[in-house]
Amino acid sequence: MAKAVTIKIKLVSTADTGFYYVSKKNSRTMTDKMVKRKYDPVARKHVEFKEAKIK
């Protein structure tokens, strides 16, 4: 069986609220860490979310 191309990642809030999103990414085309600006409902504003591994 072949190795999966897409992997699940956790996008953790940089506002240190502990809130995170789960997303998928193509590990072959996106080799660098993903950073997205999304809404954090705990902080109630848009902040950057950085990629972390799912444990």
From Swiss-Prot:
The keyword Metal-binding does not apply. Keywords: Ribonucleoprotein, Ribosomal protein. PROSITE patterns: RIBOSOMAL_L33. It comes from the Bacteria. One of its GO terms (cellular component) is cytosolic large ribosomal subunit. One of its GO terms (biological process) is translation. It holds the Pfam family Ribosomal_L33. Gene3D superfamilies: Ribosomal protein L33. Belongs to the bacterial ribosomal protein bL33 family. NCBIfam families: PRK00595.1, rpmG_bact. This is Large ribosomal subunit protein bL33. It comes from Rhodopseudomonas palustris (strain BisA53).
